[in-house]
Amino acid sequence: MTRERGFVLLAVLLVLTLLAVVVTELALSARLEASMVRSYRDGVLARHLAEAAVHQAMREIMSPSQVTALDETGQLVFHRALPGQTTPIRLPPLPRRRVALGPGEFSYRIADESARLAINGAGAARLDRLLAALRVDRTQRDIIDDSLQDWRDANELHRLHGAESDFYLQLPTPYRARNANLQDPAELLQIRGVTRELYGGAEDRPGLGELVTAAAVSAVNINTATPLVLEALGLSDAEIADVVQTRVRAPY
């Protein structure tokens, strides 16, 4: 009788253990499914919010404006010239920060690509002035100036301070010079002389990557260009100060 009772007790304990395992597995499965549902829901909401932000930004960009400038806060705004008025009027911007939509909200920022220096067509003198404004020393500027021209030209002949494929193929991760225009500003990081610190910037200065564009920009928009870009254009400190103060009141 004692043996039978012991066997029954072991059987009961085994069943209880199996039940505990099954219940635990079911609970984990339910939590996983709930987490997947939440992730899917949040993903759908995030996509709709992102699309809404893009469409609202496009509404502003496609507005009937002739002048793009910065307001007192540094926000990009659009102006429209009316017949009989010498000063363009500012179009009221749509809300861009924490715009409520359903259970979520979105924010966006509009930047002017023509506020940057066109790296493929700016010319060596403007690039050199921009590097000087970023406090790059003469030796490093010579290397970057020549290496950028070598990167863009169609041959493999390097300039005095430049570099072509023979230099880049000796690096730990070898690659060839493009021998064509840059397709993205980040490509500057592949060019001899351009460091990550120079490209990314620091707390007290912006990076080179924020000041240039690979887009085919015909002219720099002085209404939105930063003082550093204005300096690269050859403006003096007094001229830059005058432009920055005047363009807020009356864009050029």
Report the location of each language-model feature.
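Compositionally biased linear targeting/interaction segments
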Residues: T2-Y252
